[in-house]
Amino acid sequence: MALMSIVQFKGTYPLFGGEQASSSALDLTLDQTKDDDSDWEIKPLNIMKSRSQGFRPVYIYSNVTPDHMDQYSQEKQDQIILALTKANDDKANLSPRAEPHFFVDLAANDALVLSNTFVLEKNGWEGVCIEANPEYWYRLASFRTCTIIGAAVGGKPEDDGLEVDFALKGVLGGVVRPGLDNNEENSENVIQVKRNLVSILTIFNQTNVPHVIDYMSLDVEGAESLVMEHFPWIDYSFKFLTIERPKDDLKEKLKLNGYKMVLVLTLYGETLWIHQPSVLLPLEEIWSIAGEYNNTHFTRVTD
């Protein structure tokens, strides 16, 4: 009786910073072609080459149905962005568009719950969802069509691979560093893992992000300045952005590059920004459109 089976040798391969991760490094064919008690012939089928850095594909198989398809963002950011984009396209005579609208979601967190971009996808948008916490990857791959990047973001391309501590605490997790929401004082009893920073420009190059982006959602628990510190503003622009509690240095960079804060959408500091050269809508119209979806907490910004 002939018997064929595949076994995998479990090895390790180095990631950024020398971190070791489990991987299938060697596949072996065990082929018994004579009697049951004959010797096994071991043949190497494939040896996975060790890679020290860079992006790797992860293929997640899923056959599940979303539990709640009617999820919306926390303060109707998704509805506001859809309405503002439609109005701006009409004003610029860009309707209908030949290409889908595009978003960048950082950090994406859950695929559906409180997502700022799930509804955009339901309306035909394409985009990139960036999320460092593997807790969210399965649902993102199962329920979303966006390109998923599993990485902690920050720094400039030449510093890609810098090792940092990352707090795994759901939607409030993130890079652990002084001055950020996750710092050594409040992360002592939180699970922390080592992660490697990669610049947002490296991600954009990897995923062929268009140079004019319709919307960016930026909420990384106080690390927004770290993400955007070396951003190439001359090469990329965002028509609309929502940013949670941007620090003064990021606000200044935005203003210097043609952006204007027009609304504070929440009591916890979610702000709406426009790229003035790209958005043709007057402030009164922006406020009016936003007020149709969120008129409880938002504050108009006039200066």
Place the predicted regions along the sequence by residue.
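Phosphate/nucleotide-binding beta-alpha loop and adjacent structural elements of enzyme active sites
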Residues: 1-303
